[in-house]
Amino acid sequence: MDTAENLLLDRGYNGFSYRDISNALSIRNASIHYHFSRKTDLGVAIIRRAKERFAKWSESMAGKNIGYLKKLNEFFLIFKKYVEREQQVCLGGALETDFKTLPGEMQEETRIFVSIMLQWLEKLLADGRSKGEFKFVGTAKDQALLIIASLQGAIQIVRVTAPSCFASTVKQIRSCICA
């Protein structure tokens, strides 16, 4: 599943096949079909695994006695790792790009995954603003959407420019919301 996820992040869902996975792992296609009879099943499994990872991560953040800005910085690191890993895009960005061509099951899982991340960030921003750590115009929901869209866009732009574009984006986000 790791190989399939990496291919998805590099090429998009429509940019790889079971043959690409089997070639990378030096196995036969039948071995993959044994575990995932359809590519859709593999895609759904990748998204569900990502949701589980984010749930564990967000639980760990809830348990940390650190400020809201530090939690936001930890959130930025989730996206930064894609820039550092051979300039991959994040899972949300990869799936959103292919969304109209994804099977229905994957579309639904993608909606849920993106919604979970947006809700977590919205709550962080609302709580941080109520405690005076963040200051921004508009609702926390709108700000969360702006931040995630900016991070995903920065990851895309890095592919054709330089990794410093991601750092510049994060710097600008911080300057726009820090009290």
Which role fits each region the language model picked out?
Residues 1, 47, 51, 107-118:
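Amphipathic, non-transmembrane alpha-helical scaffold segments
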Residues 70, 74-82, 115-119, 123-127, ...:
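C-terminal peripheral helix-coil segments that are non-catalytic and often amphipathic
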Residues 3-10, 57-60, 150-157:
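Solvent-exposed, amphipathic alpha-helical segments
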Residues 45, 49, 59-89, 140-147:
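Hydrophobic alpha-helical connector segments
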Residues 3, 7-41, 45:
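Helix-turn-helix
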Residues 108-113, 130-146:
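All-alpha amphipathic helical-bundle segments outside canonical DNA-binding/catalytic cores
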Residues 84-105:
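Amphipathic alpha-helical segments used for helix-helix packing
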